[in-house]
């Protein structure tokens, strides 16, 4: 029997009901939106009804330019064309909790996303964007709580009630220790900060999705399909366990969590992995925590392109015409011209293909540092200092640190200053080699 290239598990020519053993097949597969939710988190549409009429599916464009001003121009353009979902990517210094004027941020400001150092930057980033009419996804982990609070503060300035703000923070910080390395604090206080964020959102931002478990990043770091499906729920259970221990009910937590897995080939292995993840999650949340709400047992799941399969040169997808035979012959002729059936990385076009790269102006870094200098000049240093002291005191205790963190950000504290203050209490993390 052949074995799957991603999972290394036996793959038969046909997997029917007779292969399901140990449990009744109906119990293991169930109907869509029914526990254990192996098939889908939503019920199927009625026959004949268009998808948009039943459940609109906005597709946010992953976007973040060097400065808040440049990124805002892009968001304004997207919203003017009907977009109702935005996806913000931050630069590496912001993801690591550094200010744009920090020595370790040199050469990285605005390179991989938008630089956000303070509430003032967040105001510019979402200036003119009606936050009650868009859903915003923020791809950030270690400092996610800070950026979420800034977003809430901008919403308050717009007069938008907190219960009208919707979006997602991809707050799977444990992934950083395993796959990416963009962590700030040691694992234990990082878990606490996630739990504090979950508890805060359930009372202050009730429509916010708090954590998306990033199996896709584990896959990009080398995890097999089975490892990806095992590690992501393991992270999720750690967050739920910490939040429940802090006093949050599991049915107030689990419905606002989701999975993000890699989309690989063959699709059959990925579909099997997705179904397995849903079954495992339902059993774990109900078995260990006593979850009862249907949404707690039917997790939402999304996929992303598995980046490891991408190459510098990929053949374009060709539309098949009615005369498919002619199209196939043309493709075969082209393949022969390229030297036969070779790998994607082996084929090279004649000459250089035109490719427009996004070049970040080096002046972005200087302008961002200048903005921070102006901020420090006009803000109240006494108010900022008192707020940071209060946040340190809360971090050293057992209270929810987000309330004190929000006060510090509202006073004008920067991302770097807030992270530095927490590092004074919690320390930093330098992982040991394997």
Labelled PLM ranges:
Residues 104-106, 153-158, 185-188, 230-231, ...:
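A glycine- and small-aliphatic-rich helix-loop capping segment at beta-alpha/alpha-beta transitions
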Residues 46-63, 85-101, 111-112, 121-144, ...:
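Core alpha/beta catalytic barrel or barrel-like domain that forms the active/cofactor pocket
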Residues 65-80, 142-153, 187-193, 230-231:
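Glycine-rich anion/phosphate-binding loops
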Residues 1-121, 125-132, 155-160, 348-404, ...:
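Acidic/polar, glycine-rich intrinsically disordered N-terminal extensions of enzymes
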Residues 80, 84, 127-131, 156-161, ...:
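Generic secondary-structure signature for well-ordered alpha-helical cores
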């Amino acid at each position: 029997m052949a074995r799957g290239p991603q999972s290394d598990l036996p793959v038969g020519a046909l997997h029917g009901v007779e292969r399901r053993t140990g449990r009744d097949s109906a119990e293991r597969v169930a109907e869509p939106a029914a526990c254990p939710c192996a098939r889908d988190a939503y019920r199927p549409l009625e026959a004949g009804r268009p998808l948009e009429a039943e459940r609109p599916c906005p597709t946010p464009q992953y976007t973040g330019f060097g400065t808040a001003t440049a990124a805002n121009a892009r968001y304004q353009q997207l919203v003017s064309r009907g977009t109702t979902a935005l996806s913000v990517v931050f630069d590496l210094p912001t993801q690591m909790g550094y200010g744009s004027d920090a020595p370790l941020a040199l050469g990285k400001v605005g390179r991989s996303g938008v630089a956000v150092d303070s509430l003032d930057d967040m105001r510019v980033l979402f200036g003119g964007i009606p936050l009650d009419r868009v859903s915003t996804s923020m791809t950030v982990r270690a400092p996610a709580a800070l950026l979420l609070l800034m977003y809430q503060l901008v919403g308050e300035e717009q007069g938008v009630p907190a219960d009208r703000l919707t979006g997602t923070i991809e707050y799977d910080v444990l992934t950083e220790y395993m796959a990416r390395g963009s962590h700030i604090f040691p694992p234990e206080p990082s878990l606490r900060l996630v739990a504090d964020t979950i508890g805060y959102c359930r009372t202050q931002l009730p429509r916010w999705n708090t954590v998306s478990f990033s199996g896709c990043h584990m896959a990009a770091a080398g995890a097999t399909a089975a490892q990806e499906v095992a590690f992501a729920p393991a992270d999720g259970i750690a967050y739920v366990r910490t939040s429940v221990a802090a006093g949050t009910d599991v049915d107030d937590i689990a419905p606002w969590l989701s999975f993000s897995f890699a989309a690989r080939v063959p699709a059959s292995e990925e579909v099997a992995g997705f179904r397995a993840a849903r079954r495992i999650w339902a059993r774990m949340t109900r078995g260990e925590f006593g979850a009862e709400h249907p949404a707690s047992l039917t997790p939402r799941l999304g996929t992303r392109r598995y980046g490891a399969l991408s190459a510098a040169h990929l053949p374009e997808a060709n539309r098949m015409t009615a005369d498919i035979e002619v199209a196939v012959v043309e493709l075969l002729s082209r393949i022969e011209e390229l030297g036969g059936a070779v790998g994607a990385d082996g084929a090279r076009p004649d000459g250089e293909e035109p490719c427009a790269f996004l070049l970040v102006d080096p002046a972005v870094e200087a302008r961002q540092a200048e903005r921070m200098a102006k901020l420090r000049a006009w803000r109240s240093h006494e108010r900022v200092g008192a707020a940071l002291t209060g946040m340190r005191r809360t971090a050293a205790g057992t209270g929810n640190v987000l309330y004190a963190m929000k006060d510090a950000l509202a006073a004008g504290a920067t991302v770097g200053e807030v992270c530095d203050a927490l590092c004074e209490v919690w320390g930093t993390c330098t992982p040991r080699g394997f």
